Amino acid sequence: MRDKIKLVSSAGTGFYYTTDKNKRNMPGKMEIKKFDPKVRQHVLFKEAKIK
């Protein structure tokens, strides 16, 4: 089952992406480097729950 998640910037800007992931294939927390336009750099984004 695919669940919706939020990827929050580790730069502390409050910027986030929303995506989904398959919990059966990726049981752990997702971490991925993406572009944060507020700091204009690629930073690490960590998974958080959508409230």
From Swiss-Prot:
KW Lipid metabolism (keyword) present: no
GO cellular component, one term: cytosolic large ribosomal subunit
One Pfam family here: Ribosomal_L33
GO biological process: translation
Keyword set, alphabetical order: Ribonucleoprotein, Ribosomal protein
Gene Ontology molecular-function annotations: structural constituent of ribosome
SUPFAM superfamilies in the record: Zn-binding ribosomal proteins (SSF57829)
HAMAP family named among the record's database cross-references: Ribosomal_bL33 (MF_00294)
Record-stated family: Belongs to the bacterial ribosomal protein bL33 family.
Descriptive protein name: Large ribosomal subunit protein bL33
Organism name: Pseudoalteromonas atlantica (strain T6c / ATCC BAA-1087)
Encoding gene (name): rpmG
